[in-house]
Amino acid sequence: MELKDYYAIMGVKPTDDLKTIKTAYRRLARKYHPDVSKEPDAEARFKEVAEAWEVLSDEQRRAEYDQMWQHRNDPQFNRQFHHGDGQSFNAEDFDDIFSSIFGQHARQSRQRPAARGHDIEIEVAVFLEETLTEHKRTISYNLPVYNAFGMIEQEIPKTLNVKIPAGVGNGQRIRLKGQGTPDENGGPNGDLWLVIHIAPHPLFDIVGQDLEIVVPVSPWEAALGAKVTVPTLKESILLTIPPGSQAGQRLRVKGKGLVSKKQTGDLYAVLKIVMPPKPDENTAALWQQLADAQSSFDPRKDWGKA
């Protein structure tokens, strides 16, 4: 009788978790299912995979199998386990063989741990303005239903009315327990995960909890200072442009950024100096007067300097 290497059959490692093993089982069950596979040994491989899954999916059976595998070269194990008849060990022999080798006291009453269905992820687009308050959203998705061989039998359309909390961030995951796929063996449903995607905004860029907005100003507003109206997520504010402001300068508006449970970010106004269109004769004369008055000013004097 031969003790099979169930981990090798499943293509996994002994250290892999149940989720990884279950994924491997589903993949192999689909690959070798006799109704699907064209390979000549598909039926035998399918039974072998099912046998491996029967043991490795049960927490206690897996622990007992690991113990048997660890002792497979021990003399006591060989005397009890190998009969020289060339037969292969299978999952049906498991209980009797384990008890004969390690004794009944080594076994404990066990129940197969409840498996659970697959989780589902759905990306949900949220506008920046919607992050300020809790709001309701209708979510529609297809719920896959798997058979015992890990293949999708059907997809059921499903619609939920969910609450999106205030202060959600890009990439945040919201769990809806039990709204995933049902387990094919009668275990609990998986979960539905809503993955938040903050939609691009035409005015604001997100930098952590802060927001940035480009504010166009005229050359004279930058030079002389001004007060300009700037939008925020909630309302418009009057922003003070200091005299002598430079292009690219960032002006902080405290508390006007993104809101979360932990903190409120700031809004940064990034100044962009916008030149007027091609000047007429009178405007050109005024620019010339300014150039003459500032003849000693060289905007490129610091080029190449650290």
Swiss-Prot record:
Keywords: Chaperone, Cytoplasm, DNA-binding. It is found in: Cytoplasm, Nucleoid. InterPro entries: DNA-bd_curved-DNA (IPR023859), DnaJ_C (IPR002939), DnaJ_domain (IPR001623), DnaJ_domain_CS (IPR018253), HSP40/DnaJ_pept-bd (IPR008971), J_dom_sf (IPR036869). Pfam families: DnaJ, DnaJ_C. One of its GO terms (molecular function) is unfolded protein binding. Transmembrane segments: none annotated. GO terms for biological process: chaperone cofactor-dependent protein refolding; protein refolding. PANTHER family: DNAJ HOMOLOG 1, MITOCHONDRIAL-RELATED. This is Curved DNA-binding protein. The gene is cbpA.
